[in-house]
Amino acid sequence: MKTKLYFLTPLLLFALSACNSDDPSSSETDVPAAKERQDIPLTRSETQLADHTLDFSLALLRQASLQEAGKNMLVSPLGTAALLNLMANGAESHTADELYAVLSPSGVSAGELNDFFSKLNTWLPELDNTTSLAQAYSLWMDDQFTVHSGYTDVAQSVLGADVRQLDFQNTQSQQQLYDWCSEKTEGCIREIDCPLADAQLVMLHTLYFKGAWTDKFDPAQTRTETFRGNLREVAVPMMHDRQRAGYAATESFTAVSLPYGNEAYSMLLVLPAAGTDMAQAGRALADGAWKELTSRLYGAQVDLKLPKFTTEVEQPLNEVIAGLGAPTMFKPGADFSKLADGNMFVSKMFQKAKIEVSEEGTKAAAVTAAIMTMSAYE
């Protein structure tokens, strides 16, 4: 039976091989009527960047699925790309070349890339007044460490980053990072695995999303059923509905698009053919299946069965990003000379993400982090 689902949006990519059955709390209140959707006005270079960001998202899914085969996988491409761009602003030479090759098509400048992420930060929350979407950036420096003012000026003025200085040897400092993450994700993510003792700088990006389905599921139709994943079977609350939705099918995948609010945002549910594992599906989606599915979507009456669940995943990213073509920043000898003096490199990059899917809609959050350390490399 085909029961493995892939949830794909521009903000989050989620592969569900076996889901948690925690019942997400529902404290929904009345929401205003959805305003008419408006698309984001993009320049020619920004349109190129939007297309490239989609390609990056699918490549990230492919690379992460290789690393996390057989496990629940939840990753935010937007959060990952946004933090990589923040790092790229401090990089030089080969380190910068690799980062910009991953993030943007040739011919797009660093300034245009910054403007693109700044525009997303401004416009994405405005697309739907019934949907909440918020991003935030921050830089956390040890009080014995100095960052070049030119770098912090860009981080603050263009990307709106908070800049904080702390005593990283003080055990209370870590709690301040936790509190910031919790505040920016509306309490969804309260802690991250971010040791400070050997760090000089921590970069953070947060993403928070909360959207109500355009057509909600009836809670009276939710009942416990068996969900068959890659490795095990679990009993989950299964939501049921028959509604008009975007639908597409190929020999390899079936897809349904479920919109939120005024339909500016939607969740694409992708069901691979029987016998397809996560790595195979991730590779196929990145190699053209995703674009084929979305181009084939048409309105149809669909009988839906969707698990109601909450799950949280912390995803290491060092090997994933290196596999995408930017390995140098993780090695002593990386060049972050636009950021600070000394031999800085990224000792750990990771993302913690959480998603709740219920009859009302979806709540999701991601914290993407990079811990930067001084090396003795000469």
Protein language model regions, located:
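Sec-dependent bacterial lipoprotein signal peptides
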Residues: 1-17
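Ser/Thr-centric signal marking residues that sit
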Residues: 3, 95, 368
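Disordered, low-complexity tails and leader-like regions
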Residues: 12-15, 24-27, 355
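Non-catalytic, conformational "gating/processing" segments within enzyme and secreted inhibitor domains
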Residues: 70, 110-273, 295-376
